[in-house]
Swiss-Prot record:
PROSITE patterns on file: RIBOSOMAL_L2
The species this protein was found in: Clostridioides difficile (strain 630) (Peptoclostridium difficile)
Cysteine disulfide partners in this protein: none
Gene coding for it: rplB
Subunit structure: Part of the 50S ribosomal subunit. Forms a bridge to the 30S subunit in the 70S ribosome.
Protein name (Swiss-Prot/TrEMBL): Large ribosomal subunit protein uL2
Composition-biased stretches (Basic residues): 258-276
Family: Belongs to the universal ribosomal protein uL2 family.
HAMAP family in alphabetical order: Ribosomal_uL2_B (MF_01320_B)
Domain of life from the UniProt record: Bacteria
PANTHER family xref list: LARGE RIBOSOMAL SUBUNIT PROTEIN UL2M (PTHR13691:SF5), RIBOSOMAL PROTEIN L2 (PTHR13691)
GO molecular function terms noted in the UniProt entry: rRNA binding; structural constituent of ribosome; transferase activity
Amino acid sequence: MAIKKFRPTSPALRQMTVLVSDEITCNQPEKSLLVNLKKNAGRNVHGRITVRHRGGGQKRKYRIIDFKRDKDGIPAKVATIEYDPNRTANIALLNYADGEKRYILAPVGINVGDTILSGLGADIKPGNCLALKDMPVGTIIHNIELKPGKGAQLVRSAGVSAQLMAKEGKNALLRLPSGEMRLVSINCKATIGQVGNIEHGNVVIGKAGRKRHMGIRPTVRGSVMNPNDHPHGGGEGRSPIGRPSPVTPWGKPALGYKTRKKNKASNKLIVSRRTK
């Protein structure tokens, strides 16, 4: 895994960097695990924009990822490690002993030919999946379930990991990448190790066209819009926003405004909030 820089033959190349991955072993995905991915450009079923700055981009196929890891006791061999355009992490294709094929997130330290196992009795090594109750305290984990059997929802981005800090009765205490300390049921599953592609966060996009290729459209300042488009808009020339503090396009405070519901059910499971 390395970051490649370019000679500044153009203004864009002066800053741009790309990731040169020696982990990826295959360019063609497994066809049986692909489904079509329809673009909606940030629109909902009524055709209205609900997420701004989305649209265009390269066509993609969605890779079906196994987040449940429910094939307990059946060994699988790592066949390939592949690029996935739908997420920051790389993915690994597993060939199970019973003939089934599944994709998982590729953790650090996994190689083609390695044997992966899920369920009770699996060793504490990268890629294996166990319930939190079967792991020793201090284990580095990722791909964590919030509800037993629902599938992993936490710690899935490139380079991140959580740590099992303690086991208390029916719950396990986890330290998440944000610094948050959170309780999760000890029956929830998690995968051993750190998510791979750890250099992803060091890549510099470098030019606008690369963002457009990713399906991300420009973000325009409110102060250069018309007053019917944004509360900051209007005025002659470079006018001030005319308010004590910045607001969103919908008139809510833009800085320091807490958006989490005060009576959310999971509040009782958060021991301490995030530190960053």
